[in-house]
Amino acid sequence: MATVLLALLVYLGALVDAYPIKPEAPGEDAFLG
């Protein structure tokens, strides 16, 4: 079970690195500005 969780963490990490899109920052900047 631990192996599956570790694989999921690595997979999600790869997705985040592949798509460094953070909708929170632009949204906050647009709202504040």
Curated annotation (Swiss-Prot):
The alphabetized UniProt keywords are: Secreted, Signal
Q: Name one GO cellular component term.
A: extracellular region
Q: So which tissues is this one expressed in?
A: Expressed mainly in the testis and prostate.
Its localization reads:
Secreted
| Principal location class | secreted
Residues annotated as signal peptide: 1-18
Q: Which family does it belong to?
A: Belongs to the NPY family.
Its name, as the record gives it, is: Putative peptide YY-2
Origin organism is Homo sapiens
